[in-house]
Amino acid sequence: MAHKKSGGASRNGRDSNPKYLGVKRFEGQLVEAGNILVRQRGTKIYPGMNVGMGRDFTLYALQPGIVKFSIKHGKKYVNVLSIQ
């Protein structure tokens, strides 16, 4: 006969898959049109010049150029400065 009653099932043991968010191209880097610059949840960083925003708030380059971050009115922006 068992000396102890059976314990209840553990209520831990679950975890969500990683989402790989964050800045993908940093300031000064050369990018091509369509390159993903930032993956984020919500508008942590806003799109600036030559930058588009996807349905899931992903920021991507619209033109080739150099990545530049800036802060205006308390908001962070990412821009792509075209090289011509």
Curated annotation (Swiss-Prot):
Ranges where the record places region Disordered: 1-20
Pfam families: Ribosomal_L27
Endpoints of the signal sequence: none
InterPro entries: Ribosomal_bL27, Ribosomal_bL27_CS
UniProt entry keywords in alphabetical sequence: Ribonucleoprotein, Ribosomal protein
Keyword Chaperone: no
A GO BP entry: translation
Source domain of life: Bacteria
HAMAP family: Ribosomal_bL27 (MF_00539)
Similarity remark: Belongs to the bacterial ribosomal protein bL27 family.
Name the UniProt record assigns to this protein: Large ribosomal subunit protein bL27
Species, as recorded: Dictyoglomus turgidum (strain DSM 6724 / Z-1310)
Gene that encodes it: rpmA
